[in-house]
């Protein structure tokens, strides 16, 4: 047995040497050889969602799918991720296939609209080709495609109304994702695909809901987020926002099926302060007695809205609560580029 093992080791060494010669050093390596770096992430803007994702945000160099019903907060979640990437000095691009991006709203969420790269392509092929070229440049930190449903194949645009184009969009997405995934990993770019829901006809058992663009995106996505509006927030009789639930239905970088709930306020986006209050109460840092919220003996306010306003005005207390929650849960976000000499940025 020993001579055979020696021969196998020798044959493997020869094969590895030949591979290194043909394809460059490091083309094949043993998994335990290098020091494994923690997965770099981009925060989502909601501490509850960062915790549900298990690593503190959306993973870099991966495909992320955000889907849900209309007006559930899909684009808002994506824009908050863009704002956080830009805040750390990153470059962001937005492929607006729906031609519906509101620059004023994006600005209110913290997006640097002057620096944001925007494309409003005519066809699905053009949109995905632009996305692929931007990713391969290696300069991008985050790219958002809004939405997959709006990526209309050229043949469909040039054809007549009523023409059948079965499977064109699915084939387009499958080809694009095959090309993109390797480039995403090499460049450390996070690609967010926003998707819409459709209903399958004739489904008797199970959910009839499905997403557009075929099955390729489901397979290539490292993270899939199901965004749902569960409640309307009111100030008296006026609707001021939505209570949103996000379920992590797929997660390749941490345990899946966790849920997060947070408030999205109209015109303001995800309420960071609201998320901190919810998480603070859950983990015992903030005490709720009746309708009053207190932190270390100091009253934050009566009712969640007053407590939110207090934290908005007193950023030092807000930052202190956030730090304690993140320390307890062991999450911290590194949104820097995936390079050896880059210093990590702690959030």
Curated annotation (Swiss-Prot):
GO terms for molecular function: ATP binding; ATP hydrolysis activity; ATP-dependent DNA damage sensor activity; damaged DNA binding; single-stranded DNA binding. ATP binds at residues 68-75. One of its GO terms (biological process) is DNA recombination. GO terms for cellular component: cytosol. PROSITE patterns: RECA_1, RECA_2, RECA_3. It holds the Pfam family RecA. It is found in: Cytoplasm. Keywords: ATP-binding, Cytoplasm, DNA damage, DNA recombination, DNA repair, DNA-binding, Nucleotide-binding, SOS response. Belongs to the RecA family. HAMAP family: RecA. Can catalyze the hydrolysis of ATP in the presence of single-stranded DNA, the ATP-dependent uptake of single-stranded DNA by duplex DNA, and the ATP-dependent hybridization of homologous single-stranded DNAs. It interacts with LexA causing its activation and leading to its autocatalytic cleavage. This is Protein RecA. It comes from Rhodococcus jostii (strain RHA1).
């Amino acid at each position: 047995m020993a001579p055979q093992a020696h021969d196998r080791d020798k044959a493997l060494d020869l094969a590895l040497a030949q591979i290194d010669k043909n394809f460059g050093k490091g083309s094949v390596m043993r998994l335990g050889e290098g020091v494994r770096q923690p997965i770099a992430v981009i925060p989502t803007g909601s501490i509850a969602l960062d915790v549900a994702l298990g690593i503190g945000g959306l993973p870099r160099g991966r495909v992320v799918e955000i889907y849900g019903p209309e007006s559930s907060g899909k684009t808002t979640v994506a824009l908050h991720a863009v704002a956080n990437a830009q805040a750390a000095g990153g470059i962001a691009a937005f492929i607006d296939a729906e031609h519906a991006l509101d620059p004023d709203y994006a600005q209110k969420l913290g997006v640097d609209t002057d620096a944001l790269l925007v494309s409003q392509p005519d066809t699905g092929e053009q949109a995905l080709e632009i996305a692929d070229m931007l990713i391969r440049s290696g300069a991008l930190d985050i790219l958002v495609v809004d939405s997959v449903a709006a990526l209309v194949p050229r043949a469909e645009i040039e054809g007549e109304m009523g023409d059948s184009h079965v499977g064109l969009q699915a084939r387009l997405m499958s080809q694009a994702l095959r090309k993109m995934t390797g480039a995403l990993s090499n460049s450390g770019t996070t690609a967010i695909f926003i998707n819409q829901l459709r209903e399958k006809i004739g489904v008797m058992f199970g959910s009839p809901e499905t997403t557009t663009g075929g099955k390729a995106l489901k397979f290539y996505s490292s993270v899939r987020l199901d965004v749902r509006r569960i409640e309307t927030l009111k100030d008296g009789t006026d609707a001021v926002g939505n209570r949103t639930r996000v379920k992590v239905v797929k997660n390749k970088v941490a345990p899946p099926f966790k849920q997060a709930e947070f408030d999205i306020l109209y015109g303001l986006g995800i309420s960071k302060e609201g998320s901190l209050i919810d998480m603070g109460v859950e983990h015992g840092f903030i005490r709720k007695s009746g309708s009053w919220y207190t932190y270390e003996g100091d009253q934050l306010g009566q009712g969640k809205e007053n407590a939110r306003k207090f934290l908005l005005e007193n950023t030092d207390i807000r930052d202190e609560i956030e730090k304690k929650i993140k320390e307890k849960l062991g999450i911290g976000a590194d949104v820097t580029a995936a390079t050896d000499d880059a210093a990590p940025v702690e959030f």
